[in-house]
């Protein structure tokens, strides 16, 4: 009997050892996954960044994938022109060519959210309105209302998009705007390590969904739209400055106890739009603390970078930053290579990389 028990005990011990070995393996494998949380206010460029990761480190977009964006491109175009038509009225601007009043009426009759065709009449009406000096003045005053960044890109290109057999290009896909609701994860494999990038909705109503994303975050990647310094928040009733809202969110994020051990990387995004806008919209008009020269892109972006970095009260916590243009694949390829090296360097031991 003792012999029998001994054999049973040995077998139980062997099973326990196997279980412990598997648990150690699972723990090690879990440590070889890096969770990167993309945060920032609405329209800061998070979804575009995810698309770039798919292009640079994933499977990209096949022709079939690209065809799937066709209707969304049409909807973005109709939405942009309707926003401009509404703003013409709000700003009491008139079309220089009276025939564009009829074009505007026709375009307003389209349901932008469900549009699935793009016909000759649409192109004629859009080109008429968009090239009208009255609407161009309206576009120049876009900080006074909410217009997507991609509006000009699409409206300048309606003839190409209307061509027979049109298939959206990668740039069309990067520019397309679909508000993120809920949480989107995009995992990709680099050097046998899984980078799991998590994009959450940036609008205020979406932020309550973030909470369960906060466990085991390797890095916070916080996106800032540099071009928003003179814009107000679409969700705000009191014309709150969009950059101030972004800074308030950033301050909250970097002080969360969940992120004590997470590195923080700041992406100062939309640098191309800032470079264009700073020539006519002066930073000091919106941020009186700015005492640098007017129309100076370098001075403006440095001031904004400092204003975010100064929010970090924990001087032990390192913040990293990069200036980015999320629609520029080569820029993101270069920046993410540096980010990846930083993250791996910070986690060498924990992720069994040494």
From Swiss-Prot:
<feature type="binding site">
    <location>
        <position position="326"/>
    </location>
    <ligand>
        <name>GTP</name>
    </ligand>
</feature>
<dbReference type="InterPro" id="IPR027417">
    <property type="entry name" value="P-loop_NTPase"/>
</dbReference>
<dbReference type="InterPro" id="IPR011025">
    <property type="entry name" value="GproteinA_insert"/>
</dbReference>
<feature type="lipid moiety-binding region" description="S-palmitoyl cysteine">
    <location>
        <position position="3"/>
    </location>
</feature>
<feature type="region of interest" description="G5 motif">
    <location>
        <begin position="324"/>
        <end position="329"/>
    </location>
</feature>
<dbReference type="Pfam" id="PF00503">
    <property type="entry name" value="G-alpha"/>
</dbReference>
<feature type="binding site">
    <location>
        <begin position="269"/>
        <end position="272"/>
    </location>
    <ligand>
        <name>GTP</name>
    </ligand>
</feature>
<dbReference type="GO" id="GO:0003924">
    <property type="term" value="F:GTPase activity"/>
</dbReference>
<comment type="subunit">
    <text>G proteins are composed of 3 units; alpha, beta and gamma. The alpha chain contains the guanine nucleotide binding site.</text>
</comment>
<dbReference type="GO" id="GO:0007188">
    <property type="term" value="P:adenylate cyclase-modulating G protein-coupled receptor signaling pathway"/>
</dbReference>
<feature type="lipid moiety-binding region" description="S-palmitoyl cysteine">
    <location>
        <position position="4"/>
    </location>
</feature>
<protein>
    <recommendedName>
        <fullName>Guanine nucleotide-binding protein G(q) subunit alpha</fullName>
    </recommendedName>
</protein>
<feature type="binding site">
    <location>
        <begin position="174"/>
        <end position="180"/>
    </location>
    <ligand>
        <name>GTP</name>
    </ligand>
</feature>
<keyword id="KW-0807">Transducer</keyword>
<dbReference type="GO" id="GO:0005737">
    <property type="term" value="C:cytoplasm"/>
</dbReference>
<feature type="binding site">
    <location>
        <position position="47"/>
    </location>
    <ligand>
        <name>Mg(2+)</name>
    </ligand>
</feature>
<dbReference type="GO" id="GO:0001664">
    <property type="term" value="F:G protein-coupled receptor binding"/>
</dbReference>
<feature type="region of interest" description="G4 motif">
    <location>
        <begin position="265"/>
        <end position="272"/>
    </location>
</feature>
<dbReference type="GO" id="GO:0031683">
    <property type="term" value="F:G-protein beta/gamma-subunit complex binding"/>
</dbReference>
<keyword id="KW-0547">Nucleotide-binding</keyword>
<keyword id="KW-0460">Magnesium</keyword>
<keyword id="KW-0479">Metal-binding</keyword>
<feature type="region of interest" description="G2 motif">
    <location>
        <begin position="172"/>
        <end position="180"/>
    </location>
</feature>
<feature type="binding site">
    <location>
        <begin position="40"/>
        <end position="47"/>
    </location>
    <ligand>
        <name>GTP</name>
    </ligand>
</feature>
<dbReference type="GO" id="GO:0046872">
    <property type="term" value="F:metal ion binding"/>
</dbReference>
<feature type="binding site">
    <location>
        <begin position="199"/>
        <end position="203"/>
    </location>
    <ligand>
        <name>GTP</name>
    </ligand>
</feature>
<comment type="similarity">
    <text>Belongs to the G-alpha family. G(q) subfamily.</text>
</comment>
<keyword id="KW-0564">Palmitate</keyword>
<comment type="function">
    <text>Guanine nucleotide-binding proteins (G proteins) are involved as modulators or transducers in various transmembrane signaling systems.</text>
</comment>
<feature type="region of interest" description="G1 motif">
    <location>
        <begin position="35"/>
        <end position="48"/>
    </location>
</feature>
<dbReference type="InterPro" id="IPR001019">
    <property type="entry name" value="Gprotein_alpha_su"/>
</dbReference>
<keyword id="KW-0342">GTP-binding</keyword>
<dbReference type="GO" id="GO:0005525">
    <property type="term" value="F:GTP binding"/>
</dbReference>
<dbReference type="InterPro" id="IPR000654">
    <property type="entry name" value="Gprotein_alpha_Q"/>
</dbReference>
<feature type="binding site">
    <location>
        <position position="180"/>
    </location>
    <ligand>
        <name>Mg(2+)</name>
    </ligand>
</feature>
<dbReference type="GO" id="GO:0005834">
    <property type="term" value="C:heterotrimeric G-protein complex"/>
</dbReference>
<feature type="domain" description="G-alpha">
    <location>
        <begin position="32"/>
        <end position="354"/>
    </location>
</feature>
<comment type="function">
    <text>The G(q) alpha subunit is involved in the light-dependent activation of phospholipase C.</text>
</comment>
<keyword id="KW-0449">Lipoprotein</keyword>
<feature type="region of interest" description="G3 motif">
    <location>
        <begin position="195"/>
        <end position="204"/>
    </location>
</feature>
């Amino acid at each position: 009997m003792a012999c029998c028990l001994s054999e049973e005990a040995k077998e139980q011990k062997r099973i326990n050892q196997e279980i412990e070995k598997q648990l150690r393996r699972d723990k090690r494998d879990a440590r070889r996954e890096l969770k990167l949380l993309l945060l920032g206010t609405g329209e800061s460029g998070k979804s575009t960044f995810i698309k770039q990761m798919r292009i640079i480190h994933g499977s990209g977009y096949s022709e079939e994938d690209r065809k799937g964006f066709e209707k969304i491109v049409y909807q973005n175009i109709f939405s942009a022109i309707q926003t401009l038509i509404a703003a013409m009225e709000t700003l009491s601007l008139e079309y220089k060519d009276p025939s564009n009043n009829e074009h505007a009426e026709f375009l307003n009759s389209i349901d932008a959210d469900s549009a699935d065709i793009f016909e000759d009449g649409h192109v004629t009406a859009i080109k008429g309105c968009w090239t009208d000096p009255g609407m161009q003045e309206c576009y120049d005053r876009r900080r006074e209302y909410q217009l997507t960044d991609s509006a000009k890109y699409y409206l300048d290109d309606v003839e190409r998009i209307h061509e027979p057999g049109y298939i959206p290009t990668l740039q069309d896909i990067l520019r397309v705007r679909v508000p993120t609701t809920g949480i989107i994860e995009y995992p990709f494999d680099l050097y046998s390590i899984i980078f799991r990038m998590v994009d959450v909705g940036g609008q205020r109503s979406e932020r309550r969904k973030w909470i369960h994303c906060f466990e085991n975050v390797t890095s916070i990647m916080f996106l800032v739209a540099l071009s928003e310094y003179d814009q107000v928040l679409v969700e705000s009733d009191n014309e709150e400055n969009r950059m101030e809202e972004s800074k308030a969110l950033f301050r909250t994020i970097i002080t969360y106890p969940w992120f004590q051990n997470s590195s923080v990387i700041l992406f100062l995004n939309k640098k191309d739009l800032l470079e264009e806008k700073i020539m006519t919209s002066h930073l000091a008009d919106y941020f009186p603390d700015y005492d640098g020269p007017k129309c100076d892109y370098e001075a403006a972006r440095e001031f904004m970078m400092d204003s975010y970095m100064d929010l970090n009260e924990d001087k032990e916590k390192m913040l990293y930053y990069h200036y980015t243009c999320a629609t520029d694949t080569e820029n993101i390829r270069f920046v993410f290579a540096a980010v990846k090296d930083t993250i791996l360097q910070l986690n060498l031991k924990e992720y069994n990389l040494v």
